[in-house]
């Protein structure tokens, strides 16, 4: 392995699953990488809505959500790790600090504490957010290995895809950042 100073940091990038993705958990997914270091990586799948909406989830955790446009926003499957835990990917809120937030270098924030949901419920929280149950995680070197085996494409993340693009269009929209579409991809790795 090269020196750590030569390492590529994929924080604030999208991982786009290649057609040959063997793991059905990640087939067809776009993952927003919140953290990538020599210790591993943590990300949130942004294009797998569940059957649970915000109203249902808030009721389960005894929060009253009365903001009509938010009631039926879906909760997403964020990945197979800690699926009972909520992860909120959101734009920074000026003047706010939540109990358990991580600022993604050059990008968004990820918060895991209930106070961000309380702020959303009262209309004082982030206006643009995506709530997931669970996250995706990779151990040291694991993600790099998957990328080297043609499992993922990477591209700089665009918050408009996370927050403004319908879930079913996010995969193609992320590929579009690279100037390609899924019809152009092959599951076979090649060498020129």
From Swiss-Prot:
Name this polypeptide is given: UPF0301 protein BTH_I1462
Pfam families on file: DUF179 (PF02622)
InterPro entries, alphabetized: AlgH-like
PANTHER family on file: UNCHARACTERIZED PROTEIN YQGE, UPF0301 PROTEIN YQGE
Similarity field: Belongs to the UPF0301 (AlgH) family.
Residues in coiled coil: none
Gene3D superfamilies noted in UniProt: VC0467-like
GO cellular component terms given for this protein: cytosol
TM annotation in the entry: none
